[in-house]
Amino acid sequence: MSKAPPEPFAVHLPSGDRLLLRAFGDEFASRLETVDGYAAIYDDASKSYVYATLEDGAYVSTGVSVAAPAPEGLAKHLREAPLIRQHRFTSRYGELRPAETDGLETFGHNAGLLTGRQRSHGAVRGLTILVEFDDVRAGMSTDDLEPLMNADDYRRHGNFGSVRNYFQVMSAGKLDYTNSVVGPVRLSRDKAYYDQHLLVEEAIQCAIDEFNLDLEDFATQLPGEPRKIVDAINILYAGESWYTRTGNGNLWPHNHRFVKRFGDVETGLYMLTGAGNSAAGLRIGTICHENGHLLCRFPDIYDYGNRDQDDRESEGIGYYCLMGAGNHLGYRAVPAPICAYLRRLAGWTTDVVLEPGQSYQLRHGDYGIAYLHATDRPSEYFLVENRSAVGFDRYLPDHGLAVLHCDTLGSNEWQDGTQWRHYQCALLQADGKKELEGNLNRGAAGDLYRDRTGVFLSGDTTPNSRAWNGSRSGLILRDCSTPGETMTVAVGPETAPQPEYQEAYPFEPIPDDAEQGLEVTMEFPAGTSAQRIQVWVEIVHTWREDLQLHLRAPNGSSVVLRRRHGGSGDDIRETYDSEDHATLGKLTADDGGGTWTLWVRDLAARDVGQLEAWAMQLG
């Protein structure tokens, strides 16, 4: 699956005009707009692109070419009704993802990954076929394509490495993915024909016939499987990728399963994308994205907009991962790294558990390490990584420390951020704006953390580090450095927790000469430290030596704060502190959460009074 590119693409009209359009969506459901925002569709009758309007919630042709001015009164940014979009998505998804094959979805049913066999470790050999059409010739040769797929230190045409190099770096050397490149093979029809008819079978057969291929060279027999299956087939066709038809174009970059037996070998997963008009147009981004599905069984971590009982669009992780929209960065020549969440699921990382009170130096590009904070749920955790403007991160929309909130049971359709509906991998956007969830952009300045002093992420900040069920995960980050090759961050609170203070004004009379006395209470939240206890009491009374004060803790333990001393005097205005009141010190505890009770007794007759106020501070 491949999300639409951010930049406009060119289409050629029957008149000979060349026009720019924008695409939104992916190969399952997409829509087109002119660069000034009018909805456009391909009109089969005129074999051209026309302005679209809505009829019963669906796009219909206005009959006016997009090369002409827009019809008067036509609104911009028209969208089909949700039910229409859902129907288009379901129909196309059924074509590309038949039920009897392994899922290729945003839901990672296999502990976060897609079902089906993984080829994410060791040496893997793929087959790459360069394809041209009867009317469109390839603008490059296999001599141009082979280094794009396999070379060390590949830097041609703005690319920051080859496909092989990309996966070597991301896997910390655990995956060595090479490709045999053949072609070009010329197909029998014009390019437009294959937008409606899948070219895969013809391309594979042509490659076998013309280059005497033995598919067994690219196949693996895994334990428990009776047959050999080709690991990966990459088909790159002549010209730019076509993002043309609304939801039904077979030339939209995609991956799928094509199953056919060739002798003792069976084909399996393939990917398909445009190669560009010349060697200068060769880019690794989309090839790496689709091979993330083929080899590693990575799900897309962007929002299809039409899955899992959700028809609202969002951006998921945006540009911050190859499997979001990150394959488009650097004009698809410098794709974003695979995020720590997916690298960890692939088995490419070793966990470094973030310990409170420790400081960490996070080196950029140390892709074999995952800095982890676990929660009480095994499927849910936080990951922290250095995403400074270095290497494959150079074109990110922001740079700094990224914090990912991960749950293998989430869905990348669910932008709600609630206990039951949340992303599989959510970027905690440092500015708290949640623009990715709001479908406002694919990433922007302010998304990542940098140059922070003191606590910048906890259960009480915005954004916060609470688990999806609202409980505190315990993750506290502070003192984040400037972005660079190495970033430092400390874990745990900067100082001891702030004391919890409460006060009350009962103005309650104290029963005279009565054993039961007066009881008043205060409630402190669970987890409140009671290493130090301070109590303030104010009582108006005509003979204070009649009074005795007790304090009872939530666990039932009780101490006497003030005994009857004899003598005379009015009123009590006193402070009791566990640091210099040995008896009160017996109630100190790590957790003082619960109900505290002040018990006031007047143990002699005649003189009376009342409890005006009292206060407690726990810390």
Per-range role (PLM):
Residues M1-T115:
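N-terminal prosegments of processed precursors
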Residues A99-D102, F107-S120, G158-V265:
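Active-site-proximal segments of metallohydrolase catalytic domains
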Residues F107-G173, A530, R544:
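Boundary/activation segment at the start of structured domains
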Residues Y166, M170, R227, D231-L396, ...:
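Extracellular hydrolytic enzyme modules, especially secreted metalloproteases
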Residues R363-A496, D591-G609:
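Extracellular low-complexity, Gly/Ser/Thr-rich intrinsically disordered linkers
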